[in-house]
Design a protein with these regions (language model features):
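Long, charged all-alpha helical bundle/coiled-coil segments in cytosolic proteins
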Residues: 1-22
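Extended, EK/Q-rich alpha-helical coiled-coil segments that serve as long dimerization/scaffolding arms
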Residues: 22-33
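Alpha-helical coupling/stalk and coiled-coil linker elements that connect catalytic or binding modules
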Residues: 12, 16, 32-191
Length: 191
């Protein structure tokens, strides 16, 4: 699209032998917008990629907040103040946990997910958070599945246009070589 825009804008001032190349380039605005609106980076898919993904991510945020709120009650409770290493909620092995002093680990019923390198802190998922964390894990699995579905759909749509994409690629490659030779000639003052 950028090459086509160049040909129609800055490059369109006068006829050129390159016009034949630019005329061969086609753009598929629908596919382009679909990809750019779905893929934010190599690691991130937009919520707007599908209504299902947006819904799942909304549920993830709600469930995370619910678990944090539940654990917040524990870390602010005076009855647990002496056993906590710090009054914070953290994440270990994709589970919300609280840091408990090693010598007090048996005083908070729950599952141990990690131990600090010094061995002085146990990261425990209180039993009251297990069901919530399980629901959160299921939501993360649903999110991964939906992302895979979206990427498969985009791949299939791209595959439907593979011949034109290949032709455009070949033309753009040729144009890149022409411009590279021109830049080199200009840099060497070999014009």
């Amino acid at each position: 699209r950028q090459a086509k825009s160049y040909a129609e804008g800055e490059g369109a001032q006068e006829a050129s032998v390159l016009d034949l190349y630019f005329q061969q380039i086609t753009s598929n605005k629908y596919l382009e917008e679909r990809i750019f609106n779905s893929i934010l980076s190599k690691d991130e898919i937009a919520d707007a990629a599908s209504s299902e993904l947006a819904s799942i991510r909304r549920k993830i945020r709600q469930q995370s907040a619910k678990i944090r709120e539940s654990l917040q009650k524990i870390i602010t409770s005076t009855s647990y103040a002496k056993i906590l290493q710090e009054p914070i909620v953290t994440i270990r092995s994709d589970r919300f946990v609280v840091p408990v002093k090693a010598e007090c680990k048996g005083q908070l019923p729950g599952l141990v997910h990690d131990v600090s390198s010094s061995g002085s802190t146990y990261f425990i998922e209180p039993m009251s958070a297990v069901n919530g964390n399980n629901e959160l894990r299921e939501l993360f699995m649903a999110e991964r599945k939906e992302i895979e579905r979206i990427l498969a759909e985009l791949s299939a749509e791209s595959a439907d246009h593979r011949e034109q994409i290949k032709l455009d690629y070949d033309v753009l490659l040729e144009l890149e070589c022409i411009f590279a030779r021109a830049r080199l000639s200009f840099a060497m003052r070999a014009i």
